[in-house]
Amino acid sequence: MEATAEAAPCVDTLGNGVITPVHNGQAGSPHVRVNWKVEGTNISITYGRPFLKGRIVGDTVEPLEDSVWRLGADEATTFSTSGDLMVGTTHVPAGTYTLWTLTSDATTRLIINAETGQWGTAYDQFRDVGRTTMTVGILATPANQLTLSIENSELRFEWGAMVASVPIMVH
């Protein structure tokens, strides 16, 4: 279900993106589309924003060790760009993709995948455009709700005490 005309966009304080509500997910996670303009290139991410609700990232909620995660709730998170990008070490041509993460051996990788339109657990590694290592840190104030943003030339996500980022630039 698409957002109604009454759903006014608001400014995302993490990266100056514009957030538009899309729908409420099956388990109550709101779904949003966030749009940014980076050096003339339009970038949007549509994803479910789950709440922790007392759960612990890596223990009782994704991302779990050695498990591919859809980087959101419900449907697979989509990432669209109107121009070619470099996301970490991965060249991403203009188009629409899905975003996933894989954490193993204390390394978190962002996966950019060419398959779109699937439910969030239907991941096909043979459709990967690329995988790139993310820089991981600890937030001073944990994020109770998953947030994806683009700021300071980085694509980042905040979830629980974790913040992970990867450089992003127009190519």
Report each predicted region and the residues it spans:
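Mid-length scaffold segments of soluble, non-membrane domains
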Residues: 67-118
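Primarily secretory-pathway and cell-envelope proteins
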Residues: 1-68, 116-171
